[in-house]
Every structure is written in C-alpha cells, then in structure tokens.
C-alpha cells in the first residue's frame, strides 16, 4: 500500500457521506506498497481502508477484483469486503481517481516469516483456490508468457547493464518456456501476488489476505510456485527447504497437488521467478527515480531463476 494522491479532509468527509460508515474521525496515509494510494480511516462506526486506484490498475478490471473479494469473503476466506454505497454502487470517485472503501483486517505483515507461517500461507492459498472455483467472472493473466515477452522486448537491450550475461540467460529461458510451458493443469482463480506484505498474521495465525489486484485465471500450481519464490528464500538468496516443505504440506492438506502439477513445479517456479524479475527489470530501467512506481532491485529474482534452473524434481522444494 502507498500514497500517491493526497485527499483533503473536507473532500473525504463529503465522500464518506455516500457510505454507511459513520462520520470521519481521523485518517492517515499508508506508506507501504507500489500500486495504489491507500488510507486508514477511523470513523464513528469503526476502521476502514480507502483505496484510490492509480494508473496501473484498469478501471474496467475493478468489478472483477471487488466481486472476487466479496465472493471469497462470503465463502469464508479472510479478506477485505468492499463497502457498498447507499445507492448500491461500490466504486466511487475521489480526487479524480476511482475509489473504494473496504473493511479493515486486524493483523500485521511479516518481515521474517517462519516455517509455521509458511504452512499457514499454503493452507490459505489452497482454500482460496477452492473458494474461487465457482466465481462466475474471469480475467486472463496479463502477466502470463505473452505479457513477459512484451516486457522483455522493452528491456532486453539494456538487461546486461543490470547483470552481465542476463540477456542470453533470459533468451534461453524464453525458448524453453515457449516450447515446454505446462498446459492443461488444474486452473481457476489465483491470487498471483501473495507476497508477505499481502498476508496478515496475529501471532502465528494467518488473519487475512489482501491486495487482489493481480488476481486472474491461471494454473493453481503457478500460484503455489509464486509463493515458494515469495516466502521460502532467505536474504542471502538461499532456498529454505524447511519453509518450502511447510508451505507445500500446508497447501496439500487442503488441496492435494496432482502428479502432473508436482512434475511441473520446477518449470512453473522458474517462470514465476522470471515474471517478477521482468517487472522489476522493466521498472528499474524505464521508471525515473521519484516517480509513482516504487522500483525494486531485480537481482534477487535473477538469483531465484538460476536456482530453479538446477532443480530436477519438486522433492527438492520439500514436496513429500
């Protein structure tokens, strides 16, 4: 979460009159994040999150994202619930931006998750996949292989400025993926961005999932692979087998992976690492410092890609 657009108190108070959230008592911007402007609201009826959607989120996608959050919440997934205005709408306009109020979730994101936390994430991810299976709306993954290629075409000529030899490495990865990317595996709604800053905990118990603005339809096992990348590597880029084993066991306790999904996990993990490396690389090379987008060093995902290239079996991730 972050703040890129300021909101005047009077303007916010008038906006809130359209919602059943009581009177504004106080509000403050939330500094963390990369995509939208977020504020914590305290009102006479409780606490809420206000999100203003910046340019990277397409307004046409908002009904999918918000509808999914409502669907999952109604299915028992602990995630924010959009607040409906008095006129029945969910999406409003504030400070010239599409704006939504969502319920507040208790908990904190973790900087140093343990294996116990990873097991909780695995269970929650599987529960999300099952709960989303009958969601009636669909959204293609804009950051699947075709989307990766567009990013790579824009960044390739300068890739070796970041890491010597990177262009040749990624070219070889693309050749492999475009021939051998897994097809026909179980698929449906995935979160696609379940990083530690998008998961809240109260102690060792997971209390909520947030930030569904990359959610889409894709392979369930690809979502698992993304979580392996996000949760199971240490600061020195080493893979923590104990965390990997815990995350995968947690997932399989709710939704067992098929044999085909297990066999595909090394390639899916490498592809997921490439996807996040590419978005970071593109921003690193094309976004000016001080702009609306928070730039992240692509190096850690280059290291993950190299790790996954050497993996021969999902058992090396801790899969029983």
Swiss-Prot record:
InterPro entries: Aminoglycoside_PTrfase, Homoserine_kinase_II, Kinase-like_dom_sf, Pseudomonas-type_ThrB
Disulfide bonds: none
Pfam families tied to this protein: APH (PF01636)
One GO term (biological process): threonine biosynthetic process
Coiled coil: none
Matching SUPFAM superfamilies: Protein kinase-like (PK-like)
Keywords from the named record: Amino-acid biosynthesis, ATP-binding, Kinase, Nucleotide-binding, Threonine biosynthesis, Transferase
Cross-referenced CDD domains: HomoserineK_II (cd05153)
Listed GO MF terms: ATP binding; homoserine kinase activity
Major enzyme class: transferase
Listed EC numbers: 2.7.1.39
Pathway the protein acts in: Amino-acid biosynthesis; L-threonine biosynthesis; L-threonine from L-aspartate: step 4/5
Reactions accelerated catalytically: L-homoserine + ATP = O-phospho-L-homoserine + ADP + H(+)
Family from the record: Belongs to the pseudomonas-type ThrB family.
PANTHER family xref list: AMINOGLYCOSIDE PHOSPHOTRANSFERASE DOMAIN-CONTAINING PROTEIN, AMINOGLYCOSIDE PHOSPHOTRANSFERASE DOMAIN-CONTAINING PROTEIN-RELATED
The protein's name in its UniProt record: Homoserine kinase
Source organism: Mesorhizobium japonicum (strain LMG 29417 / CECT 9101 / MAFF 303099) (Mesorhizobium loti (strain MAFF 303099))
Record lineage: Bacteria, Pseudomonadati, Pseudomonadota, Alphaproteobacteria, Hyphomicrobiales
Name of the gene this protein is made from: thrB
